[in-house]
UniProtKB/Swiss-Prot annotation:
It comes from the Eukaryota. Residues 162-212 form the DHHC domain. Belongs to the DHHC palmitoyltransferase family. The chain crosses the membrane at residues 34-54, 66-86, 207-227, 241-261. Induction: Not regulated by salt stresses. Keywords: Acyltransferase, Lipoprotein, Membrane, Palmitate, Transferase, Transmembrane, Transmembrane helix, Vacuole. PANTHER family: PALMITOYLTRANSFERASE ZDHHC12, ZINC FINGER DHHC DOMAIN CONTAINING PROTEIN. It is a multi-pass membrane protein. This is Protein S-acyltransferase 10. Expressed in mature embryos, embryo sacs, cotyledons, whole seedlings, hydathodes, guard cells, sites of lateral root initiation, root tips and phloem, but not in xylem. The active site is at residue 192.
Amino acid sequence: MGVCCPFLQPWDRARDQCLLNLPCLSDPVRRSSLLLKLALVALHLVFIGFLFLFDAEFIEKTKRDPWYMGCYILLFSATLLQYFVTSGSSPGYVVDAMRDVCEASAMYRNPSTTSIQHASRKSESVVVNVEGGSASCPRRPPTPWGKLVLDLYPPGTSIRNLTCGYCHVEQPPRTKHCHDCDRCVLQFDHHCVWLGTCIGQKNHSKFWWYICEETTLCIWTLIMYVDYLSNVAKPWWKNAIIILLLVILAISLIFVLLLLIFHSYLILTNQSTYELVRRRRIPYMRNIPGRVHPFSRGIRRNLYNVCCGNYNLDSLPTAFELEDRSRPYTCIDMLKCRCC
């Protein structure tokens, strides 16, 4: 043991220095997320690298038609770039929206109230717990955020029933607390392990573009692999490796293609994965018929809200609106673009 210690001490010092310079490596969750990202990038490089390594005709084709490989490399780079953009994007946290509302409301208050709020904002937990806790201080009026959230629910709703039991913030409709991020997410869809972040209101469109580019890249790469196998006979071990990669690629393509179709349907109907899967467990959606999409405003407006970044909070529809949306479409409705 005494012989190993001199060798272990430099290693421990190097490890401590690495953790000091890279704090993300000291957190097991962030470390595993970083390793998954590196594995995904490495997998992309493996698929394109084997073609360059094994297929001499592919290299010659690249020299003859540089535009072909140029377009492929452009798509390859755009896909990885979109992956990192989506991974680093915010899904739309309630605490951020609450801070924006409180700051906008503070502009219309007198200076003394504003200074008190700025002093209390130094600790986010104080702002959320003290002002939002109407149960402990019944005489204190609700915060601007609390008023905004209450307006999104039917009259008579208690603010206590809308408060998250984990981060103690008032939740608008379509909000859920993510235990991986330890925050409440607006229009929560799901927590993506491969991206290391939640998919929510503010990055659902980025996520859709990523899986769209990934699907296109998989199809293009699959075509190149099939073209490689259809050429002149090659050594069996090369064909075995290519066939193995081709099977993995085909499985990946099926997965991302189904994911693309599924999320396209969600966007067109203004739904989320959580609302679709856990519909019966959400109190305000429990009694709504399954064929009714309570937050849908028509295909055109749903697309506009997603593509143009219209991050408005959705209010619960009234009984009249639900009845109107549950009515089946007729030919006249189609001509009037009621579905849009």
